[in-house]
Amino acid sequence: MGVWLNKDDYIRDLKRIILCFLIVYMAILVGTDQDFYSLLGVSKTASSREIRQAFKKLALKLHPDKNPNNPNAHGDFLKINRAYEVLKDEDLRKKYDKYGEKGLEDNQGGQYESWNYYRYDFGIYDDDPEIITLERREFDAAVNSGELWFVNFYSPGCSHCHDLAPTWRDFAKEVDGLLRIGAVNCGDDRMLCRMKGVNSYPSLFIFRSGMAPVKYHGDRSKESLVSFAMQHVRSTVTELWTGNFVNSIQTAFAAGIGWLITFCSKGGDCLTSQTRLRLSGMLDGLVNVGWMDCATQDNLCKSLDITTSTTAYFPPGATLNNKEKNSILFLNSLDAKEIYLEVIHNLPDFELLSANTLEDRLAHHRWLLFFHFGKNENSNDPELKKLKTLLKNDHIQVGRFDCSSAPDICSNLYVFQPSLAVFKGQGTKEYEIHHGKKILYDILAFAKESVNSHVTTLGPQNFPANDKEPWLVDFFAPWCPPCRALLPELRRASNLLYGQLKFGTLDCTVHEGLCNMYNIQAYPTTVVFNQSNIHEYEGHHSAEQILEFIEDLMNPSVVSLTPTTFNELVTQRKHNEVWMVDFYSPWCHPCQVLMPEWKRMARTLTGLINVGSIDCQQYHSFCAQENVQRYPEIRFFPPKSNKAYHYHSYNGWNRDAYSLRIWGLGFLPQVSTDLTPQTFSEKVLQGKNHWVIDFYAPWCGPCQNFAPEFELLARMIKGKVKAGKVDCQAYAQTCQKAGIRAYPTVKFYFYERAKRNFQEEQINTRDAKAIAALISEKLETLRNQGKRNKDEL
């Protein structure tokens, strides 16, 4: 017999069932939401190269093409592919680190390549230690470091790129130490390749700071590549003889530079001319390279006790004719790389600064200083000995300090492990610690950027909590790749905003208490302190966008609305006023992503559309009254009419500044004139006004996107130049006569009063501000011509 439940019991039991279901469902979700780093088997500190290598290994193992009998293969591969797509992208990685997968709702991915792609096309040079795969954020710093770079721009799907790969690897091994060999994957870094003018693959370019890039056009053999590279290597080999020997040696020794000399005699082997040239390039600025023909310089060779062919390194101050009692290094190898490594290993270490003189030395010069504890770990990398030479022209001295000799000094600088830092000539007050790669080109780029920027390392003693001047503080962790990528941009921004804002960085792995005090929950978190006001930066990691953010703080482009001001400014707006309003909530991630784009859009619409935002967390009742049901809700309030209160809601997929701007401008009344063949002839070709014309076709997508921009241009030049539009679908003959071959085409028709006729110029940009600037420049030229003609009369 069944048991009847009363209504209250039924509702109570139903709630329990639903609660149990939700608990089980959430447990399943948590169980399946695997950490992206764990999926790929990498740490949170993994570099882009390590992430690519880990993904490739898994892709070859788990790809559905290799597991046709596994029904879960597709789903399993999608998970690791998703993890890779997110972690390889700097912006997505930052979102994931900060918000988890919820922060990636607008970036769902879901596509992957065939197994053959991952086996043969993916990460072509990731396993080659002599070849450095460069990414956009590090490219400029690398090629401007002062070293010579030869870079291969390739595409994974390009057959010629794969044909070149074995030769490029052999070439890289051949010239290792002579110059840097790089590679750029244009499939991953399309923007970088476009910026560098790369439009075919493979494209090979030589880069050196201070000179224009040089493209290689020869055949792709190793010998031809070596020959081309050697043309750009700075190498001078001196033939030594009785007439120049003493002066050459003494001059070099006085400058602290030694000599590598190969003596060529009848017996034994001396270095070939090609090997000597390569060594000269590899040791440029560190050691002079020379050779001596003992057949013609017999007495000189005998005085040096040289009786057979040999090669020797003479350090500064060596006694040349007494090889038993000094540090002359005789070399048995004939291989350039082996000789290079042995010579550079024997070069003296950097100057060791003492605790007593440290403050004074740092106060009078700019220094790159290595901190070590007892043994100098940097001596294991002989390449770093090039730093002194490569930083000489930047007036940066290079030294080291042993923290075990004065622990208090390092503790006060918050140096607790081997590190390097730049000191900017003001003692220990102004310095910046390096958090990048411990390799030559990265250290060079850091040193040059840091001494010329205004970023300082912060600690409790100099944290600007109550400073009267505004500060931008970057809270970061050294293990976080997006944090490291942001640091060079902060240095650039500090130069752009010098005198307006101070810049500092705070390492949250060292100063955990300070970071907790300011509730720092993700890295990097960038905050502007302006006395009692604190503003968190949410934009992209670029100097330009940081500059925009600061400018917006000083001169806000978006009106922060309250229910009262919304009623006064928006609801009761003047007849000819229009508004765009963002209804948002601070906890909403898409709202946070939108905010910098919203501000950027507002700056471009100044004087045309009023832009505001209202916090629906603070004014929840008001937003409910306005029927705001989701965040962010973007509304356009058109000019007031006799109609009831109305607005347009934005339903577009893209919430970037450009898309929102185009959408808003589309509601404004047309200012330009629609022209027919008759009016085009009468007003433009036979009239006496300047005209800018948009030739378009209604079916053309780019034309539709450009239409609001052209209306913005029409408003900007109103009163100076008239703006018109010609429909080339309706009036094909008119457009044909005007020489129109693509849509949209913009032409400027300017009336020359002196000649009483029209001239025309095609404009090759679709940016309203740029077009307006070009037109203003042309009008100024016409005015100056008119003045000169009057003066001549």
Swiss-Prot record:
Q: What is this protein called?
A: DnaJ homolog subfamily C member 10
A Pfam family matched by this chain, by name? Thioredoxin
Q: Which UniProt keywords apply?
A: Disulfide bond, Endoplasmic reticulum, Glycoprotein, Oxidoreductase, Redox-active center, Repeat, Signal
Biological process (GO), any one: response to endoplasmic reticulum stress
Secretion signal, residue range per the UniProt entry: 1-32
Any single GO molecular-function term of the entry would be: protein-disulfide reductase activity
Domain (J) ranges: 35-100
Q: Which InterPro entries match?
A: DnaJ_domain (IPR001623), ER_disulfide_reductase (IPR052460), ERdj5 (IPR021170), ERdj5_TRX_C (IPR035674), ERdj5_TRX_N (IPR035673), J_dom_sf (IPR036869), Thioredoxin-like_sf (IPR036249), Thioredoxin_CS (IPR017937)
- Documented EC number(s): 1.8.4.-
Which cysteines in this chain are paired by disulphide bridges?
C158-C161, C480-C483, C588-C591, C700-C703
Q: Which residues are glycosylated?
A: N530
Q: Which GO terms describe its cellular component?
A: endoplasmic reticulum; endoplasmic reticulum chaperone complex; endoplasmic reticulum lumen; membrane
Top-rank taxon, per record: Eukaryota
The major lineage groups are: Eukaryota, Metazoa, Chordata, Craniata, Vertebrata
Q: Where is this region: Trxb 2?
A: 348-463
Q: How does it assemble?
A: Interacts with EDEM1. Interacts with HSPA5 (via its J domain).
Trxb 1: region residues: 235-350
PROSITE patterns assigned to the protein according to its UniProt record, in alphabetical order: DNAJ_2 (PS50076), ER_TARGET (PS00014), THIOREDOXIN_1 (PS00194), THIOREDOXIN_2 (PS51352)
This entry's comment on induction and repression of expression is:
By endoplasmic reticulum stress.
Q: What is known of its domains?
A: The thioredoxin-like regions Trxb 1 and 2 lack a redox-active CXXC motif.
Q: Report the outcome of H63Q.
A: Prevents interaction with HSPA5, leading to prolonged interaction with substrate proteins
Gene (UniProt): DNAJC10
The record places the motif (Prevents secretion from ER) at 790-793
Which species?
Answer: Homo sapiens
Record localization:
Endoplasmic reticulum lumen
